[in-house]
Amino acid sequence: MNCSIQYPVRRNTILLGLSLVLLSGVLQLGVAVATITLVLVTGIESILGLGPAIFLAAGAFAALPAGRLMDRIGRVPVIAGGFGIGAAGCCLIALGCAIDNAVLVIAGFVAFGAMNGSVLLARTAAADMYPEDRRARAISYVLFGALFGAALGPLVFRPLFAGKDLELDTLVIPWLAAAVMALGGLAVALLIRPDPRTIALELHAAESPNRPHAPPAPVSEILRRPGVPSAVIAALASFAVMVGVMNLTGYIVVGHNHEQADVFTVISLHIVGMYALVLVIGALIDRVGRKPSLVTGLVIMAVSTIMLVWAESILWTSVSLLLLGLGWNISYVAATAELVSHASPLERGRLIGTTDLAAGLLGAGLALLGGVAYTEWGVAAVAIGATVAVVAPARAILFARRPAAAPEPV
């Protein structure tokens, strides 16, 4: 690949991975205490799932404009801007906890979610720099960084909770620490150059030297290209179910009479499942194909969610969440690689952004519904509902008829 010689692709890949280290570390705090933060600041226990739903919805709504902006001005400004917004959001949450102000906490959750929605588009930047037969691996290289975030999160946050009662004052310092980590992500993002979009355009021209560049197609047209619908379905189901279950983990663990600090153990192992094998998985997806990988990932997620019906110990809850992360990993990487391969460099941001918008809104809805189901009927209702939500799309993808070929991006 000529671009790998002309441009520092490896360096950019490492920096993108490092940005995911910091994002993952920050997100662990949100996953562990977002629900409890909002309950404490409002005093209303019936709003389980609302905190995660707020930042999931915010991330979803940020994803599409962030994707469009990536196609227009480049990947780096959007990733860096996302970290900046997230740092401001964490500061707002800390201030809201300090003065017991729910409005500030909610505003902070919105900014926190916008950071997640923007920075996760880094996987588009990873795929930009590699040829089609290596795109799943390229995405896996960057996502692997989040594994180290799984270690960074507990190292930073667990000592801040150790031996303390869970009150609003206890949450101020952890949220400020998260803001510092987000600023670190901003600094790392600004070191990425040239912008991966520039590399993608040159690589695309080298792969199709005799084909003129067409203007970006409307998203509605891209979504009709063969292979895209199945990838979108898998992306929506895997992401929505994963975040819907993950964001209730704090209350599920505490509800089984475990300590709040144990939540970080479970979440850390969940993130290990999400990312520990991602390098191997990326290579396997490139080898065995994306459609089988989409279905395999969803089936593993189904096994993990049904386990929650009887898993009460920290050990078995951790195993369930680890498998949930592993199944998501397979479906997510395969879906992203499939989507990127059916879009030109000037279409990828908006396609991934549109998918993330839908997945985030669905995830927010499932987090809210899961909170209601958990409050009214317990963990079993959450587990059974989540299992159905991944089995149905897996079956649809497996038995879908492949449509006639449609024009591919030029």
Located regions from the model:
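Juxtamembrane intracellular "pre-TM" segments in multi-pass secondary transporters
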Residues: 1-10, 194-231
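Helix-loop boundary and gating motifs at the non-cytosolic
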Residues: 3-57, 229-234, 242-253, 259, ...
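Hydrophobic core of transmembrane alpha-helices in multi-pass small-molecule transporters
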Residues: 21, 102-117, 316-330
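Intracellular juxtamembrane helix-capping segments at the cytosolic ends
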Residues: 34, 117-130, 330-343
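C-terminal ends and interior cores of transmembrane alpha-helices
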Residues: 84-99, 300-312
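Glycine-rich segments within core transmembrane alpha-helices of 12-TM secondary carriers
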Residues: 138-157, 358-366
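C-terminal membrane-cytosol helix-exit motif in multi-pass small-molecule transporters
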Residues: 153, 157, 179-205, 395-401
